[in-house]
Amino acid sequence: MIKRIAQTAGFTGLLAALLLTLLQSLWVAPLILQAETYEKAPATEAVHEHGPGAMTGHVHDEEAWEPEDGWQRVLATTGGNLVVAVGFALMLAGLYTLRAPSRTSQGLLWGLAGYATFCLAPTLGLPPELPGTAAADLVQRQTWWVGAAASTAVGLALIVFAGNWLLKLQGAAIIAVPHVIGAPQPEVHSMLAPEALEAQFKIASQLTNAAFWLALGLISAWLFRRKGENGQRA
């Protein structure tokens, strides 16, 4: 079983990471590069002078290493995506041991659940941001993000698997808790990039992550079932 999980996660993570990198390179990265031109423009130096804590999420360190545009950035992005994709694929394969998909298409439902948990729900309070956008304290944002993802995971599990309607309602309430509390916000809302570019970036990020999660769910379900069938024949 461990071999089955590892093989499923490895191949799924590799394919999903390559897909994510391709979509990011073609759609998301150009928007980020365009936003960086506004952040680095000399005319915007005065815009950087915000009130205390207004830009705590974007402190710049000229000495910090950053991958250069081109192959370095693509390679760094691919490596990061691979680690994340394999980790999520391991999670899905582990869940399949508890409730194995009877059809490959059920992997799409698991992918949708992953997208809702780790992307959609957290970004309702903390939408993806371009460089030069004001943000709240990093630790506070990370804490809220983890809480939103955990609440969504528990809530969805109760809604889908609980047989009691009261538990299903409790699941919906659990999902809503972090959003009722509210995500941490900066003292002053400001951004250097145009609003139209920000809107394009949010759409691109959501659709790219949706494609990633659907691919992750579909491929992992197919591989998990295939490995199981091969094991039974052996």
Predicted regions mapped to residue ranges:
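Juxtamembrane/disordered regions of integral membrane proteins
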Residues: 1-234
